[in-house]
Amino acid sequence: MKRIVRIVVVSVLLLAAIVAGGSLYMLSYSLRPDATMRAKNASSYEYMYGEYPFLRPWVDSLERTGALRDTVILGSEGERLHAIYAAAPEPTDRTAVIVHGYTDNAVRMLMIGYLYNRDLGCNILLPDLYYHGQSEGRAIRMGWKDRFDVLRWMEIANDIFGGDTRMVVHGISMGAATTMMVSGEEQQPYVKCFVEDCGYTSVRDQFSKELKEQFGLPA
């Protein structure tokens, strides 16, 4: 009897260790994909120029005239958070804050920046979310805490572009989910519109989908 109990206890402990180890691996795989993000950061401009050739002359023009600029703020934990921004070709109060998706960065949203800046004549600000691009951080936060950073970037954009803007916040994928989370907070009068492009309904649903598609595991 004692031998059976020992076997059961050892089996339960072993199973618990496997589950714990697997869970930690999945969390690291999902929220700290360092190699993937380093590769994407290093190749962002060339990737975007390959996918969207019209971006190169536009970005070259912005850089040549000093119109494409960087700015940094400190996050709630003291981390440096980075963004790029550019004024519209002609003075305007119309302003877009553009939020990227999972493992992407500000540069990889320049096709949307082009739409707002070049085609629609808006000021633009594109932040690197926590742990993405040139921003610091410990892990991807899937939008929930990022909403507070985006709210701060909205204030920064309003200050940069004159203090009395008319603002749209546009997000894609995880950035779209972040945008919807932002929309649930109290807003300043200058915020006029939110654009949600392909956001997820919940982090749980998103992780369940990825577990099934990438690993064939039930969730």
Give residue spans per PLM region.
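Conserved alpha/beta-hydrolase
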Residues: Y116-E136
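Alpha/beta-hydrolase active-site loop
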Residues: A139-F161
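The serine-hydrolase catalytic nucleophile loop
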Residues: Y102-Y116
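Short beta-strand element of the alpha/beta-hydrolase
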Residues: D93-G101
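An N-terminal hydrophobic leader/cap segment in hydrolases
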Residues: I4, L15-I73
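Hydrolase active-site cap/lid region
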Residues: M181-A219
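Alpha/beta-hydrolase fold nucleophile elbow
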Residues: F161-S173
